[in-house]
Amino acid sequence: MEMLDAADLRPAPLPGVEMTFTLAGVPSADVNRALYAMVGARVCWTDRFPWTHADWRAWVERPELSTWLAMAEGTIAGFFELEAQPGGDTEIHLVGLTPAFVGRGYGGYLVEQCTRRAWQRGELWAAGSGPASRVWLRTSTLDHPNAMANYRRRGFKVAAETTGPKLVPDPRVAPWPLPHDPRSASRRFQEEELIT
């Protein structure tokens, strides 16, 4: 899914509590890994299961990547990862709420604020990368049931669709406990992404 102009971003309703968004000033493999596990376990984020600590460090310590923490009620409510890519592209790699904040109406506001910051690359983060000319993300039918509708409500449009197999790991070999067996989800997924 993609957005080609910052003016296309449609605001979400304000959440019932104040949410703040802070750029992680010190890249931390441990923080990103913990948030990936906390948020992603419920929506079949499995692609990074095989990553070593060195893989995580290599990922988060790149100057073009930024990690943002969403706080509400003194608690981490969610996070997102943004990457400044060549040619003005900004990819939203991950965006999601922690389990305690799912179902409370905060998802739209999280995606709105994530997208606002994606458009502000070169200003708020990724110094020297230049302005964004496109913001894009990948999602799938294995994501949260409301994710695709939320992205559309914020102004994202489908750029391309692909259907293919997804390896869904046996939860007994997951690097952290999972709340349910992801193999019960569909083994096929539709991925909406920008194909370059």
Residue map of PLM features:
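Short, structured patches in soluble enzyme cores that scaffold and shape functional sites
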Residues: 5, 94-96, 139
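Conserved acetyl-CoA-binding loop-helix of GNAT-fold acetyltransferases
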Residues: 94-97, 103-120, 134, 146-153
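Short acidic/polar active-site loop segments enriched in Thr and Asp
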Residues: 66, 133-135, 157
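Short amphipathic alpha-helix that is part of the acyltransferase structural core
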Residues: 13-48, 177
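Conserved beta-strand-loop-alpha-helix junction that forms the acyl-donor binding cleft
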Residues: 102, 128-131, 136-147, 164-175
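A conserved beta-strand-loop-helix scaffold within acyl/acetyltransferase catalytic domains
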Residues: 47, 51-54, 60-67, 71-99
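Terminal substrate-recognition subdomain of acyl/acetyltransferases
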Residues: 1-18, 153, 157-196
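Alpha-helix termini
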Residues: 120-130
